[in-house]
Amino acid sequence: MGPVHRIFSSFARARRNGARWAPFQIADKPSPSGGFLFFNGVMLKTPMPTQHELEMVTLEELVPKDHLLRQIDAAVDFEFIRAKVAHLYCADNGRPALDPVVMFKLLFIGYLFGVRSERQLMREVQVNVAYRWFARFRLTDKVPDASTFSQNRRRRFTDTTVYQEIFDEIVRQAIKRGLVDGRVLYTDSTHLKANANKGKFDVVKLEQTPAAYTEALNAAVDADRAAHGRKPLDRDDDEPPSSKDTKLSRTDPDSGYMVRDDKPKGFFYLDHRTVDAKHAIITDTHVTPASVHDSQPYLDRLDRQRERFEFKVEAVGLDAGYFTPAVCQGLEERGIAGVMGYRTPNHKPGMFYKRQFKYDAYRNEYVCPQGQALPYSTTNRLGYREYKSNAQICGRCPVRSQCTNSAIAVKVVTRHVWERAKERVDARRLTEWGQRIYARRKQTVERSFADAKQLHGHRYARMRGLRKVAEQCLLAAAAQNIKKIAMLLARKRKKGPAGPDWRFVRMLLRLVSGLRCSFDYPLAANPQS
C-alpha cells in the first residue's frame, strides 16, 4: 500500500469511528531535511528550505531528454545565421555584440512557446534552464537586456532581407531532409489585428495600384478586339491613376481597413502563406495590408518559390478568393493545375441566374432562357466581352422582369477574355482527383494557421508598421518549420508505431480505402489538365 493510499485509508477509518478531523502532531525527532507530521499513525514529511544549498549539477542533467528544444538542436543547424549577418557587424570597433546565432535562437524561443513580448521573453530565459541550455547560457550567465532586440531591429537589420534569408534557409534544410517536394502547394491568407485603434482614422484618397497582370490583360484585350474587328482602345499613359476614399489609421498607417463577410471590421494585416502538401512545411509568407485582395500577390509569390527553391509545381489548392480570371490564366500559362473553391455569386431574388444563359462558342453568342441570341458587342477595358440582346425582342418578352431592369430593354451578359481558363479550373474541382487535392487544404494550410494563432501568437501584430509585421510573420513561420522539422525527424528516429513497418501498413490501408494523399497523384492523373 502506497503512502497516499495509507493517508486516505486513515481518513476513512477515522470517519467510520465517529471522529472528526484529528489534529496533526509534530514528530519528536525530525530529520535534517524537514520535520514530520503524524495523522492517525501516518507520517507526512514537511520540506525544509534548501534554496541555499550547493549542488554539483549541469544544465545537461536538468533538461529532459525528450524536450522540444533538444529535438530542435539536434535537427536544425543555426550556424548559417552568423554568415548571413556578418556584413552588418563591425569586426574592429565598438563593444562585443551579442552573438547573432544566440539572438535569433532567443527570438525563436519566444515564437515557439508563445511569449508575446521580448521583455517577458528575457524574464522566461532567466528562470528556464531549457531556454538557457538551447541558447548556450550557463546558470549564472546574465541574460541580454530586452532592448538588445529592438536596437538591433532598428539600427542593424532595418532595410535588409535578413529575416527572409533566414526563413528561406530553414526551408532549404527541410528540402535537403526530404520533407518538402514542391509538387503540390496550398496557399491561403489570415488576418492579424493591427496594433491600432479602429476608431482613430482619417478618410483619405489613395491611388489604386495597377495590378501586376495589367500589361498582360491589356494585350489580351487588344488581341480580342482585333479578332472581332474592333479598334484598339486608347490608353493615355499620362492619365493619373484612379483613387478611392479609404480609412487610414492614425496609429498604424501601414495597416489596412478590412471589410469582409464573416470577418471582423477594423485595421488588420494579411499573412499570405503557402505550405507544401507533403508535411505542411511553410514555403512562403508574405504580408500586405488587409485591404489587398488575396489574389493580387499570388502569382508573384508562386514564381518566387519556383525560382528560389526550384520547385516543379504540378498542382495548387486554393480557396474561392483566388478564383479570378487572372490567377486561372496565370496557372495555365505556367502548366500548373489549379483546384479552387467555389463561391456562389450574388443573385437578386426573382431574377434569372447567369448560368441559365448558355454560351455558344461556335457562334460566339449567348442564348437566353427564351431561346433568343445575345450576339457579341464589344470588349471593354476590364477584359470583359459584352453580349447584348435585341431591344425590340426583349421589349415584348413575357419574362423580361426576370431578366433585366434596363430602361432600354437590353440585357447585357459579360464574359472575360480568360473565362475559358476559369471554366477548366472549375471543372477540375468536380473531378475525384480535384476533390482529393482540395480536401487536403484543411490538413495543411488551414491547420498551419490554426497552430500559428493558437500556439504562436499569430492573432495580433506585436509591432507597428508593415516591415515589422513582416518580420513577425517570417519568424513565426520559421519557428513553426523548425518545430515540425524536429518532430518529424525525431519520429523517424524513434522505433515503434512511427517506424517504417507501420508506415508501410498505413500505406496499404490508404490504397485499399482509396484515401491516398493528394501529392501521390501525378499531374497525368488529372483528366482536365
List the predicted regions and their residue ranges.
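Basic, short loop/linker segments at the boundary and entry of helix-turn-helix/winged-helix-like folds
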Residues: 65-108, 113
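Aromatic (phenylalanine/tyrosine) cluster motif
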Residues: 8-11, 24, 36-39, 519
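Anion-binding and metal-coordination hotspots
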Residues: 39-40, 45-46, 114-127, 137-529
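Hydrophobic alpha-helical membrane-insertion signals
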Residues: 41-70
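Residue-identity detector for glycine
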Residues: 2, 18, 34-35, 41, ...
